[in-house]
């Protein structure tokens, strides 16, 4: 029986017909404790999902759908290393990277031992660099760490580093290079000193074009200062699942950190792919980061579905995507330190859930995924919230609020007020009675107020979740990221798709190689479609006129 044929799914269709014409204002008017009932705390996070177009029966039916998809079994498979891809290879075992309290796995003991060894290696290097004992080619201590990677190898560490900057030990600084455009590289290193700069090359296969090209630029940049290749070897570290290729590329064996094949790039910040972060904030704080994620893992495994934060977050997304036909979802963090979080979550969602084939190879017959995007509040309020408030689409929003930036900082009351104000306005709207009252109180005549009111109405009934962190620290950040990882995994289980591959991306890389050869006038262009062939010829024409 397919997902859409299951009894809970059919019941959800009827429930959608019932609720689609109702307004959330009425839910709150009829239930004064709705905000209390539809909220929970776990792993250092507070989650309010009361401003959603659901009642308790909806939640029950969504949970029944999850059970019908064998979610309990699939959760245990995630934590036991029993998930495999179409080739039978283990995937999605990133949760093992943060099992900080105990290692009660019945299988994969070798993986656990390797993780422990990796922790020790990360810890030792972090201590050496932070204490100034790791030297460059002129015997000066390292002050700047440049992470070269792309996708999850860059987005995760950069997002976490920016979020945890108050925990970075001066004078250490981290920088992140990912783009093939050489501007990214040269603008980053422009103010750096080659004598005190360490490059961390992160590539699972060590064949990624963008990463290896930037590594070549780094080598050239260092050689201009050091003159001799043997002097710059201490300025490179590698994080990879292909250590032999990294060594062939010139990275010393002792400077190679393991990234296992069963860790996807977008789930890799917990591994040595987070080496730059571990160095910057120190091993103790990095371990807190892992501990926060582990706390959310424990909650995810143990809590009942209707009290389970990741599961509820996922089921609400399913509700809007598959029944309200939402095509997009927004993430709005109200903290400058979370500026890169929307980009990170965009990749996590869209690369994991952008699939049209089920696990058995058959076609998907229901919508999967959505465009996930966002920006910082309050910037976003003056940019695109207008679409949320008076547009015609259903766009679910996750608001993320931080009460205090750190133990020493003041409460972020103005930010919090804006965050909560947006969520309330999205829910209740601004009806004609309220608009007219406010306009008349401003001294506007009734006839003119009638004309103006039409343009100021806000229908409301737009869904949102609010997630609150008491303080943005390594523990709470780890918990927040794990929350969204598990949310995405639950969605993949219900849609019966593989969240751990990205073959569409791989195909694009392959075609880029063919097109590059054509642009270098080395191959026949007849294999390309007429549009691509014409574009190639246009580039060659301009290239011929401009050396």
UniProtKB/Swiss-Prot annotation:
Instruction: Please state what class of enzyme this protein is.
Output: isomerase
GO molecular function terms attached to this record: carbohydrate derivative binding; glucose-6-phosphate isomerase activity; monosaccharide binding
GO CC field: cytosol
Q: Which GO terms describe its biological process?
A: gluconeogenesis; glucose 6-phosphate metabolic process; glycolytic process
Q: Report if keyword Cytoplasm is assigned.
A: yes
Q: Which domain of life is it from?
A: Bacteria
The principal localisation class reads cytoplasm
Q: Which reaction does it catalyse?
A: alpha-D-glucose 6-phosphate = beta-D-fructose 6-phosphate
Q: Which InterPro entries does the annotation name?
A: G6P_Isomerase, G6P_Isomerase_C, Phosphoglucose_isomerase_CS, SIS_dom_sf, SIS_PGI_1, SIS_PGI_2
The pathway noted for it is: Carbohydrate biosynthesis; gluconeogenesis; Carbohydrate degradation; glycolysis; D-glyceraldehyde 3-phosphate and glycerone phosphate from D-glucose: step 2/4
The positions flagged as active site in the entry are: 351, 382, 509
Q: Where in the cell is it found?
A: Cytoplasm
Q: Which PROSITE patterns match?
A: P_GLUCOSE_ISOMERASE_2 (PS00174), P_GLUCOSE_ISOMERASE_3 (PS51463)
Enzyme Commission designation: 5.3.1.9
Which key words are in the record? Answer: Cytoplasm, Gluconeogenesis, Glycolysis, Isomerase
Please report which protein family the annotation says this sequence is part of.
Answer: Belongs to the GPI family.
**What function does this protein fulfil?**
Catalyzes the reversible isomerization of glucose-6-phosphate to fructose-6-phosphate.
- PANTHER family, alphabetically? GLUCOSE-6-PHOSPHATE ISOMERASE
Name the record gives this protein: Glucose-6-phosphate isomerase
Q: Supply the source organism for this entry.
A: Coxiella burnetii (strain CbuK_Q154) (Coxiella burnetii (strain Q154))
Whichever gene encodes this chain, its name is pgi
